[in-house]
Amino acid sequence: MQRTWKTLASAAAATLAAALLPSVAVAQAPVKIGVVLPLSGPNAQFGINSRTGIEMAADAINAAGGIASLGGAKIELVVADVPSPNTAAAATQRLVSQDQVVGVVGAFVSSITLAASEVTERAGIPMITHSFADQITSRGYKYIFQVSAKATTYGKAQFDYAIALAKQAGAPFEKVAIFYEDTAYGTAQAKGLREAAKAAGITPAIDEAYPLGITDVAPLINKLRASKADIVFPVSYFNDALQIIRAMRQQKIDIPTVGGAAGYIIPDFKKGLGEYSDGVFSIAPANYDFIPELNALYKAKHGTFMTHEVIMYGAALHHLAKAIDVAKSRDPEKIRDAIAALKICDTGFAAGIPGGCTAFDATGLSSTAYPVFVQWRGDDLVTVFPAKAAKGPAIWAGKTLN
């Protein structure tokens, strides 16, 4: 697999996977992998981006010859559009029972992943996800794997990184506001924020959930203004992220804003807000400036930078494909064991994840990934913290930090 990754920058065709080097004369039946994502509804853009990463990885593996140990069998993606948790179980069951997939990748939205993984666990089918919620790998399940850190880790880092930068800028904060969408992702990440604030001796001036799909953020923003908070930590998907930042800017609430990933770190955030996005910080699970050569190839084709979902789900598919190759089998149990044992580092999509690897602990949680801080600068997101990962300086309260 390593050889193909080394040719990424120069390959004319998109080569975004490891070379599995088969040489066979007889065509093998494809290896079916299920893909569960919200391709319609309010989170469709996340699902579309995630599917792009999965398809890029699968296409390149197939172009390189397929799964070597299975005689060059090609990967066949079986995609299910799952816009809400209510449809996740039935859609995933169809993939397992009718399509007989050997593994599943998805579903970005934590509440959808929680529902889908109930089905894969009962069926004994491995699933790899980038969803954040702590519950995903805290249920004692055997067949679910998270390529990212968990949500409370992101929440804690979201707060602790902000404290570090504010202190460096000579502008420490005392009054904080926490807003979060009320599904599994937002609730878990807000818990991490809350715990970090408590550890710092700070009681949030605002700590408020709002419903997913909110259409009027005016009450939240009015509370923010009245609180006289020094900083705000919103944990949002996409439409809610746009509404919160737009309302803040329109009401000239000019305080450091640290988003909770998701809607704050995709190109559509900039498209939707224009100059209002400038200077906004966010926690992030990955960033394209870790893999500039891959990003250049992606941008030439898609016109935007490679998003975190593309990186994380490309890495997830790559890990699953390598596990199938190592297992030398279509048996989901053997594939599951190979997923758990594998550690893939510093190659392809995995290099775009802080920590540089896809690898898992005994619970299925990533054993290497950690969050980074990114900041909007014009059309770009720059990784600015921690120092070991930074690709540029942070600008905090108007001060450029070294």
Question: What are the language-model segments listed below?
Answer:
Residues 2-11, 27-402:
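Extracytosolic ligand-binding ectodomains
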Residues 14-15, 25:
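Cleavable N-terminal signal peptides
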Residues 20-27:
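Sec/Tat signal peptide C-region and signal peptidase I cleavage site
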